[in-house]
Amino acid sequence: MKNNWWKESVVYQIYPQSFMDSNGDGIGDFNGIIQKLDYLQNLGVDVLWICPMYASPLVDNGYDISDYYKVNPIFGTNEDMEHLIEEAQKRKIKIILDLVVNHCSDQHEWFQKEMKDPNCEEASYFYFRTTENDKEPNNWRSNFGGSVWSRLPDGRWYYHTFAKEQPVLNWECKELRQKIYEMIHWWLEKGIAGFRIDAITFIKKDLSFASRPTNDGELYPVEKLTDYKGIGTFLDEMKEQCFDKYNCMTVAEAPGVDDAAFERYAGKNGYFSMIFDFGWENMEGENDKSSIHAVERWKKKMFTHVAHNSGIGWSAIFLENHDQSRCLNKFLERENISFYSASALASILSLIHI
């Protein structure tokens, strides 16, 4: 019987660049994390979520990965990473990593090979289009602004959900999926206890690539491009071939997954152990600068979610993450920020399910 150990675990997120610098170069590193393991253990931490530490040009804070098997040398060596895993295990602390497989860096070997030879095998790992009028293939918008399409010197266009330096991976390609699964196994065999899976609801595309209707002045087309029909085929396969073989924790960053889709993602037979529900995020961005109103909106959304999904599956409750401002600044006026107001917000994480 599967032991859902993560249900009883306290997870601590570490952004390695700013966490602890062990050698005085101004950048956090693996040895710095090792130095703080006893402190983290005393805090009651069971799991460390370490944000991207892979080889990367750092265009998007490490979410643009140029080599899934190598760590970024600014943090140390692969041996240092293995030492961190070992030292954490001695203290009964598990480590989960970011898994970024919707896209990679344009400096990744796969994309670089395609740039040299458009007929190579790796060309099928990405989405390329040509147009007759020199205009973008459609009106889809990047999450970072502008078109999802960038043009190559030879006139072709390649697809990117986020920055132009992050070409999207083509999950329709079986050979690519196997490469991804091999990498997942490699890290799990190293002793990693699971993954926080980045932008996973974007991996299935509308292969018609037809333009979508838009609202005047809106950044994105009206019809969503996340959790697209057919995505379950890929997610079930990844779960069966990778996650089910290990008693690991998986938490999906799941924009576009509403309460109606929650069970598919985090239910008893869901694709993942749990999800981050982004229905609660960015309350301060709704044309209302009143923090009191922001709290009311946030509370309503959270309570609705918990009431709907209680007993269906597991959802990671959070107040902020690395993509958002600090919750104290989000929900409180400056003069009201104190130990007591911070404690009141923090108590929500523990009491929401009681």
Question: How does the language model describe each region?
Answer:
Residues 1-352:
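Active-site and adjacent substrate-binding regions of carbohydrate-active enzymes
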